[in-house]
């Protein structure tokens, strides 16, 4: 074939199917490599490479050979449908919101800002750093569907914490009809049975969701991603990858180079160090940070959004947030607890005296460690002491540290065992008393509670005692911690979010404090112990105090009380954290900006030092820290505005006044032409359609989540009524293991795309439908053309429809082209 007949943007036919050339490379022998996107029914949406030296039957689609065939349908229905389908399947170029309003969520304009901001950038990349509970997952979904509508969201990978893979996957499907294949341990096992050993799952499945730890720890997956490229990568809770020297950070930096668009989300996007935050910004835009590493707000403001609840001005949106109620449950320590803590205080004072004499801090840190463990529970403190005793017994030699003094450890152990044997745990008694006062007995109609505790030993201790004291079956209390497998975590979170769950109390470690939705059917949370980090405390409280909580969130703190000097101060320092978190919640919106350390471990150390100095005013002092990020994010002048344009929406081109009319005509046409049988499709009412999952459709939709795909001969229920879809989501939460029965009816739904491609296929590529209309001037013909220019990846950068009027003599009407979109 001649060398000059192939060019980018050209349509070709090969092996009986049609393709659009996105790139042309010259082979060593003068032949060509044609990179192409499939556009006919069987290959639509897939990428191919043709070697003209091998495929010598490639022909170009010649528009001059097009035959005009009269549309004889009533009202030219087929012509209208063909034009509308072409328009809906085409990609648009716009800096405004076009398709997201059709998805199933309550639209709040502040949620549009990340996408609007990203669309203005040469590469759409954005950090969504909104505060806890503002709906960052919805904001990410808006970005994804808008990019898909622009032809830049075919291949998507989402990285999330293993505990929320299923939660994120459901949100994307239920609200946006984005099918993400979940690659947790169960999903990986499933695809191993489907794919050959050497098959790259990221090439087989276009849209996936996986834990970054799975990628990090699986050498084969690392090999796969090195050979893959994505249109969009989403990294949820991106603060976990901020350290580029860690395995996670190194992997995230690599992945940021394997995609075009990038979305990072985190309510705590930095740890207070400029270098750490610069690592995140460099993933978004490497040139944003000056080479010197010294940057300011002006350098990075295009690449992030950050708002808090207090910044949301729309009253209708604020109504989705309920004002929380704080309940402090003071617990008077028992004599046995006081005896233990006085012993601990003596150890602390002796250690402080030793520090003044030049000794190390080891003894002080040991005394604080057992204090912190005891504030979680006597059981947790006993587990720590027992572990220490075993280490000392097996050590070849002991040091002079208190923690290595066997007699001290045995004395501590004896006092803790005494507390437990006498059932003298005042905090547990207060918890039990509070539950009884609230009328709670663990029955199915009783309120659900989330309990947070730092130590796994405390979690197990609480489960055992609550089950015994309330005579509860094992299924009534669940406990969640980081040692559970990804599937166990997903199943537990999913079950607790269902109305028919039998779990009445879910006891969680801080592994559940990030990103997990626990507010469905639960509005009561108890901090059984108080974390020594405001960031952790804020994240805990945000599990039930978040967007979409329809009841008043009740947050309980169990606070130990004592009048013993020294101990009283230590306990008051810990209690001050709860007051300061509440102050920050009401005013700043960001608890991390109080200490300005932006790192849980650093905040815990800050509290340790406050106890050492007996400084009850430690939370009022902020001087001397390296990087005051509140200057960047906290002040009014730095906050992202709810909208960055007065008119954020652009209505997509359509020749149908309502979507419902288009879908009605589409399915009537497919049935009347015999392309599908009447039993496959059923329009129950305007905007509500039932589609049977036929063997053919099931094969096309192979990459849908198994939970979302009906069995063969069962039905999809699609509706344009967003309220109905949202009710279906709520109904699904009432029953374990179910996804929403209704799905959103719009052109991005995979099943709808399949039926629109069938309509397109009903008109041969060398045919153009012709229709008569009295609205056009006499002796003229008007042609509708679609023009598209793509980049090297096959992504459209220009796409528009034009109407060209031609007179009988061949001249243009007024020599003008009319853009349909304008």
Language-model region placement:
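SF2 helicase/translocase NTPase motor core
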Residues: 41-116, 120-124, 136-139, 145-248, ...
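A short beta-strand element within the Helicase C-terminal
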Residues: 229, 276-279, 516-529, 554-557
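Inter-lobe coupling linker of SF2 helicases/translocases
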Residues: 197-198, 203-204, 209-230, 241, ...
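Conserved SF2 helicase motif VI
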Residues: 533-555
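C-terminal accessory region of SF2 helicases/translocases
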Residues: 74-78, 84, 92, 551-742, ...
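Mid-to-C-terminal oligomerization/interaction "stalk" domains of large proteins
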Residues: 350, 696-822
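SF2 helicase motor core recognition
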Residues: 218, 272-273, 507-522, 541-549
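Conserved Helicase C-terminal RecA-like lobe
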Residues: 321-332, 369-505
